[in-house]
A protein has these predicted regions:
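Catalytic phosphate/metal-binding cores of nucleic-acid and nucleotide-processing enzymes, i.e., regions
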Residues: 1-123
Length: 123
């Protein structure tokens, strides 16, 4: 049975979601488990988070789920260490200007090391 899960995004990531350039998101573990095939309802806040309405950006189907660990100098996806080029590609696909931008964002928002889930979808 397909379940629906809401994912909210900061405004900096919205243009990439709307135009279809962003096909993944990295999140802390969720209480309600997402499965491949589930619907991901991608949204953003219209104003102040939790004090405004949510705006629906896209509705997509989850195609891949991987455990991800982001450390100060390494990134592991499903237990495999990513190469420098793979980390650079991940950072860009996640909407960051590069590896340093991604690492700073995760350090500021979650602290490092951070273990979570990488969700992927197709446009």
């Amino acid at each position: 049975m397909q379940r629906r899960h809401v994912f909210t995004f900061q405004s900096r990531f919205v243009p990439m979601i709307i135009n279809g350039d962003k096909h993944s998101t990295i999140r802390l573990p969720r209480t309600r488990v997402v499965a491949v095939g589930d619907i991901m309802d991608l949204r953003t806040w219209s104003g102040v988070p939790y004090r405004s309405k949510q705006t629906k950006l896209r509705e997509v189907v989850c195609t891949e789920i991987h455990e991800i660990t982001i450390r100060e100098i390494y990134v592991f996806v499903s237990g495999r260490t990513l190469s420098y080029d793979e980390v650079a590609q991940l950072a860009t696909s996640e909407g960051f200007r590069g590896i340093a931008d991604m690492m700073l964002w995760f350090f500021a928002n979650h602290s490092l090391p951070m273990t979570g889930t990488l969700y992927r979808w197709k446009s």
